[in-house]
Amino acid sequence: MTRPYIKRLSFTLLDSITDKDPMVQEQVCSALCSLGDAQPDETLHACEEYLRQHDKLAHPYRTKILRAMETVLSSHIHDLDKDTAGAVILLATSEMTRTKELDCDWQQAAGSVLVAVGKRFTNQVMEEVLSRFQPGMLPHSSVLHTLANLSVSNAFDMVPFLPSILSTMLPMLSMAKQDALKVVFCGALQHFSESILEYLANLDQAPDPTVRKDTFGADIFGAYDVLFHHWLQSRDAKLRLAVVAALGPMSHLLPSERLEEQLPKLLPAVLGLYKKHAEAFQISKSLGQILEAAVNVSSRTLEVQLDALLVALHAQICVPVESSSPLVMNSQKEVLRCFTVLACCSPDRLLAFLLPRLDTSNERLRVGTLQILRHIINSAAAQMEAKQPFILSSMRLPLLDTNDKVKRAVVQVISAMAHHGYLEQPGGEVMVEYIVQQCALPAEEPEKPGPDGEDLAADSVRAVSIRTLYLVSTTVDRMNSVLWPYLLEFLTPVRFTAALTPLCRSLVHLALKRQEAGADDFLIQYNANANLPSPFAMTTRLLVVSSNPYLGDGRGAASLRLLKVMHQNIHPFLGQRWETTMPMLLEYLDEHTEESLSLKEWEEKLLMFLRDTLAVVSDNIWICQLSQEMCKQLPSYSGTPQEKNFLYKCIGTTLGAASSKEVVRKHLRELLETARYQEEAEQEGLACCFGICAITHLEDTLAQLEDFVRSDVFRKSTGIFSIFKDRSEHEVERMKSCLILCYGHVAAQAPRELVLARVESDILRSMFQCFNTKVLGIKVETKDPALKLCLVQSLCMVSQAMCSSAQASSFHFLRKTELVTQMMEFIRAEPPDCLRTPIRKKAMLACTYLVNLEPALEEQTQADVVHSCLHSVMALPPEAEGGDGVGREPLYLDTVCALEDLLTRLLRQNMTPQGLQIMVEHLSPWIKSPRGHERARALGLGACLLEFFQEHLLVSTLVPFHNLGLLVGLFAPRCADTWTTTRQKAVGCVYSLLYLQLGYEGFSRDHRDDVAERLLTLQDGLVNADPTILFHTCHSIAQVIAKRLPSDQLISLLLTVFESLGDPDKNCSRAATVMINCLLKERGNVLLEKVPEIVSVLRAKLRDTQEEHVLPAAQHSVYLLASQHCEAVVSSLLGSPLPFDSHTCALWRALAVEPGLTAQVLELLLEKMSKDVPFKESRAFLLGSTADRVATLLPLAATCALYEVLSAPSSGTVVLELYPQLFAALLLRVSCTVGVQLPRNLQAKERRSTSPARAARNLDPCSSAVDALQALLLRSGSQDMLRCVELERGWELLKTSAGHEDGVAQLASSMAKYAGPRLPPVTKALACTQNSVYEIQRVTSTAFLAELLSSNVVNDLMLLEPLLDNLTARLKDSSASVRRLVLRGLANMASGSPDKVRAHGPQLLTAMVSGLDDGDEPHSPVALEAMVGLSRLLDLVEPWDLRLVLLHTTIRIRPFFDSEKVEFRTASIRLFGHLNKACHGDCEDVFLEQVVGGLVPLLLHLRDPQVPVASACKFALCMCVPHLECAELAAAFYKYLQEGRSVHFGEFLNSTCKHLMHHFPDLLGRLVSTNLFYFKSSWDDVRAAAPMFTGFLVLHAEPEQKTQVDLEQLIVALQLLLKDPVPGVREKAAETLGRLVKFA
C-alpha cells in the first residue's frame, strides 16, 4: 500500500505546485521534501512519474519539483536504491535536454539533480550523460554544465573520466558556432582544469596516485589552441571573459615547452583584454595564474614581456575606483598578486619601473605606485631588503605632495617600511618627521566625497598617521632607537602643536621602555643632541599646553604624563615630589569633562604645581633659566590667547620665586617693551603676571611700571602727533589700558600692609596719569570704552584691596568723593537701552568698597549715587535679562548683584526706619511703574533691602516703627501683580515688614510668629495666575496684615492702599479692593455702616461695567430681596430668557447664601421641574415615521436654575438635607432627556446669540440635567464620586442612548464606593419610580439598583433583601432591557455579596437559566446576559444546585461557540470554562464527554480573529485540562496559555497534539473528524488552523492508529482546501498532506 499511498499524497501536492501564491508553492515543495525524508524512494518515483505524465507542465513548476528532488537526494543519497537512482537519472537527463535554451533555470535544476545523484552513482550518471556526449555531435549545453559541475563536486571520481571526455570534446570545439555554446565549453574546460589541479595537489588522498599532469597536456593544449587562436578574438565580451577565465588554470596543465612557446603571444593577448573590458577581475585572476605558471617553468619570456606587463598592471592599479564593491576590491587584490609574482622574479626591473613614477605629479599614478610599493615591501620583503636605500631616496617627492589621497598612501608605505627596517637607514628620520607632520594636520570635520567618490578628508590622513605613529612606537621594537629621543624634537615647534597628544603618548611608551633598560639608556645627552629641546623648554611647553587640557584629543593628560616620565631629564630633585603631585592633577582631569571643568580652577592647580616645583628645585640659576625660556616662548603663542595668558601667569610665578632682583627687573622691562597691547587677552595676561610677581617683588614691580611710563617708549606713543609716528591712537589706548590693569592687579595681589601706603601716592596717581590725556595742557576725556573698563576694573581691585586691609578703618581716603563722582559719570554715560559692557557692574562694585572708607559721603551725594545706579539698571529693557528669568545673561545678573551690594552698604550707614524709608522711596517710582519688568526688578531690590535690614536690626530701646503702614501699603497690592516674580517678592516684603514690627516691639530675631508665618504658606497660592486663587490669597494676606498691624497704622495703610485703586496694573487695583474689604470686615463696624451705600453703588455698576468687584454687591441685593419675596423672585427669574445670561446666573447663585432661603428655593425648583411633562413628541414631516422629542420649557428652565443654585458653595447644608429627592429627580431628569431636542425657537436663538453676557454652558436638555447632577454631587461633598465617574467617562455615557446604562452603572458604583450612607434614602426614592410610565425611567432606575448589588455596602446597609425582591419582581417586565438589567443585577451578587450567593443559589440559577431561554430570538441579549451572569455565579453556588442545571446549560450554550457574534462566542466559551472549573464529584463523569467534545473548537478558536474570544479559549482550556488527568498536557497548557502572553500557536498546537496522541491515542479519529467540520469555517485563521491541527495529530500518532482515520475523506477535504481562496489555508493544507506520510 505504501507506494500507491505516497503516490497519491505526492500527486495531490504536485497538483498544487501551480498555485499562484509563491508561499504556497514553497510549502508544497517543503511538504514533498517531508514525504521524501520519510520515503525517499517512493517520493522520488512519484515526482518522476508525475513529470512524465504531465508533459505540458510549464517549466517554472517543473523546476520547483526538480529542486525538491535535489533536496531529497542531497539528504538521502546513501539510502537510495539503484533502481530509483536509475529512474531519476533518466528523468533528469531528459529534463535537462528537453529545451535548447541556454542558461535556463529548468536545465540547471535538472543538472543539479544529476550532480546530487552523481556523488554516489557516478558511473551511472556518467553513462547516461556521456550517451548524450557523442563524438562528432555538438552536445546539449546543459550536458557540458553538468559534466563541469560534477568534476568540481567530485574530483576524485571524475578525473579518471576526463581524458576520454577531453578527447571527445576537442573536435567539438571547432564545430561550435554559437557564442553562448562556446562560453559553456570554456566554463567546462575551466572546471575540468581546476578539478585536475585539485586532484594533482591531493595525490596522497586520490584513488589513483599514478595520474600525472602529462596525461592531460596534449588535450589541454589542443583545447588551448582553439580557445586562444580562434575564440579569444570574438566580438562577444562574455565569450572573451570565459576564454580568459579558462586559460588561467589551463596554463598550469600545458607542457612546459608549449607554455614557453605560447607566452610571447598569450601575455600580450591577455593584457589586451584590459582595454576591451571594464570589469577586469577575471582577466587579472587568470593573468596571475599564467604568471605563476610561467615562473614555475622558469620562463625566459617574462623578461621580454616584463615592461608591457608592468605598464598594463600599473594602469589597472591607477584606474579610478567607482565603488568599493567586493568584485572591485578582489580585482585590485589580483593585480597586486601579479606584482608579487613579478617582484619575486625580477625585483630590479620592477623597482626601475615603479620608483621613477613616484616623481609624477599625477595624483592617481602616484597613489597607485605607492599602493604597489607598499604591497611589495610587505609581500616580497626578502627581495626588497637590499633595495632599501634606493626606495627611501625615491620617496623624496611624494613627501612634498599636498594631496590627501597621496598623503594617506605615503603614510601607509612608511608604516610598511617601519616594519621592515627601512627607517633605520640614513634618511629614515625624514619619514618619521613626515608622519608627525600629518599628525599635526587640523582635525577638521570629514568632507563630503566628491563626484568620483574618492575624496578623503584631511582628518582621515591625520587619523591614519596617528594610528601609524602609535603602532610603530609601541609594536615595532626595532624602531625604538630611531624614535628615541628623536621624537622630542617635535615637542616645542608650534607647527607640530596639533600632534602633541599622539607624540606624548608615543614618547611616554618609549621612555618607559628606556627606563626599564636602565638609567644610561634613558638619560638624554643634550650636548650630543643639539636639536633636542632643553629641560626648560620642554617643561614650559608641556605645562602651557596642559592649561587647555581637553584640546587636541586630551593633550593635557598626555603632556603631564610625559612630564612625569621625563622628571630625571628635567631636574634630579623632582622625581619623588612629582610622584605625589602629578597623579592628583591627572585624577582631577579624569573626574571632569570639557563641559564640567573650570579652566580658572585648573589653571590655579597648574600654577600651584609650578610653585611647588620651584620650591622643590630651590635653585635660583635654574629658576632664572626657566623664566628666560618662558619669556622666549611667548611669541609662539600669539595664535592661542588663552595659553599665552597662562604663560604670562607662569612667568609671574617663576619671577616671584627668583631671588635675583636684576633678573626680575630685566624680564619685567622686556615684557612691557615687547607685549602686544592691541590684544585684550594679552593685556590681561601681562597684568596677571605683574600682579603675581608683586606678591614678592612689589617695589621692583612698581618701579618698572613707573620707569616704563616715564620712558621714551611710552612718551613717544602718547605725544600729540603720535598718529603720524610709531603707533596709532588705538594702540596708545591699548597700552594705557594694560598699564592701568597692571596697577590694579598689583594692588589686588601685593601684601595689603604694603599697598595702603602706596595707593594715593603711586598707584592711583599713575593710573589716572595713564587715563587722562592732555593736549596743549588741556585735559581731554577719553572716549575709549575699553580704557574706561580697565580703569573701573582696576579701581575696583584697588578699592577692594584698601577695604580688606587691617588698617582700613583708620585710613582717611582723600580722593574718595572724587572717585565716586568719576564712577557715577561712567555709569551715566552708559547707553540706557542696552547692557553691553561690565562698566556699570564694576563701577558699582568700586563704589560699594569706597562707601566703607572714611570720610562718609554727603547725603546729596548718596542720593545721587542711588538715583543714578537705579536708573542705569531699572530702565534697561527686559531683553537684557535674556528672557523670563530663564537663561539670563550673566552680565545682567552680576550687575544686579552689584547694585544690591551697593544699596545694602548705603543702608548700613543709616539703619533706622527713616533710613529704610528713604531707600524705599527711591524705589517707589519703579515699584509703581507701568512696565512689569521694572516693577519686578524694584520688588527684588526692595526684598533685598528689607532682608538686609531685618538681619542687621539692633533695637536698643522700644521705639515705634512709625512708617510700617506706609511701607506695607506700598508693597501689599503688588501681591496680585501680573508678573509672578513680583507677586512672590511682594509677599516676602510684607513678611519682612511684619517681622521688623515684631523686632521693634521687642521680640528676639529668632522669634517665629504663627500669624506672620502664614504668609509663607500663602506664597504658593500666588504662583497660580488664576484670578480666583490669586485674590483669595490676597484676601488671606490682608487678614494676616489686619491681625498684626497696630491700630495707629490702620489709617495710613488704608490711605496708601486706596491710592493703589488707580494702579496701572489692573490686578493690583483689584487686589487693593479685596484688601480694603478684608481690612474693613476684620476691623468691625465700618463695613456694616457702609453696606447700604456700597450695595447701591455696585448695583448701578452692574449695568455699566464688567468689573468683578461690582458683582458681589448686586448678588447681596438679590439675596435681601429674595428673603422677603422668595416665590416671586424664583418665578420672575424662571421667566428670564433661555439660556440665562451671566448676570442672571450670578443672581440665582446669590439665593444660596442662607440655608433657610436655599431650602425654599430648591423645593420650588423641584416642583417646577416635575410639574410639567419632560418632553413632547412632534414630527418634522407629516409622513415621517419617527417622532422627535422636544423639551418643555418650564422643566428645562428649572433644571438650569437648579444648576446655578447648586453651584453656590453656601448651598451645601441644604443640599445634604434634600439630597435623596434631588438625586432621584435629577437622575430621572437625565434619563428622560436623552436624545431630547430643544424647541426650534431656542435652537435658532442659541445659534444667533453672540452676547458676551451669555453663559458659556450648553443649553442642551440632557447636558443641562447632567450639569445639575454634577453640581449636586460636588455640593454634597461627593468630589471623589464625581471624579470617579469623570475618569470612567461616565458623564459622557449618560448623555448617549448607547452608553446611558453604563453611565448609570458607573454612577451607582461610585456612590456605593464613596457615598454609601446615602444609599438607603436614594434607593427608596428610586424604587418608587419602578412603575413609571416612561420605559427609559424604569431602565435607568433598574440599572442603578442592579449595579448596587455589585457592592458589599448593601449588606452593611441591610439593603440586599429589598433590592433582590425589587429586581426579581421586574423579571416579567415588558421591556427586554429591564429584564436584561435584572439578570445583570442578580449576577452582581457574585462580586458584591459572594457569601450570600449560596443561600440564594436556587433563586439565582433559576433566573439565569430562564434567561437562557428568553424569547424566540436566537441571539437574545437577555440570553447573553444570562451566560455572563452564570459565569460569575458558578463558583459560589452549591454543587448540588449546579448539578441540576449543568447538563442543560452546557447543551444550551454549545451552539454559541461558533456564533457569528463575537459577544456570544466569548460569553459561551468563558461560561464553558467556568462550568469546568465549578464541576465537582459526580459531575466530572457527566461532564468529561462535554470536555472532549469542546476540545477541538476551543483550540481552533485560539486563532479567532477577535482577541476576547481567543482569551476566553485560553481560560476555558486551562479549566478543561484537569478533567483529562494528563500532567504533561496540563503543563503545556499552563506554559503557553498564560493570560497576557502571546501564543505561538504552531508550537503550542504541536506540543498539545504530542501529549494527546501519547495519552489518548483512541481520540485520534474523533479529533480529526471534528477538525474536518472546521475545514469549512468562515474565519480564515480558523480554517487554516484546522488542517494544521490535523497535521500535528497525524505527526504524533502511531502508524497503527491510522485505522481510526478515514484517510480518503481527509485527503479529499485537504484537496478542497488546496483550492481555498486564502493562500495561508492552502499553505497549511499542503503542509498537512506532507505529514500524512506517517500513515503510509
Swiss-Prot record:
GO terms for biological process: lysosome fission. Keywords: Lysosome, Membrane, Repeat. Disulfide bonds: none annotated. GO terms for cellular component: lysosomal membrane. The keyword Nucleotide-binding does not apply. PROSITE patterns: HEAT_REPEAT. Pfam families: HEAT_Maestro, HEAT_Maestro_2, HEAT_MROH2B_1st, HEAT_MROH2B_C. Belongs to the MROH1 family. Lysosome fission factor. Recruited to lysosomes by RAB7 (RAB7A or RAB7B) at scission sites and homooligomerizes to mediate the constriction and scission of lysosomal tubules. May sever membranes by inserting amphipathic helices into one bilayer leaflet. Lysosome fission is required to maintain their steady-state number, shape, size, composition and function, and to accomplish regeneration. Homooligomer; homooligomerizes at lysosome scission sites. This is Maestro heat-like repeat-containing protein family member 1. It comes from Mus musculus (Mouse).
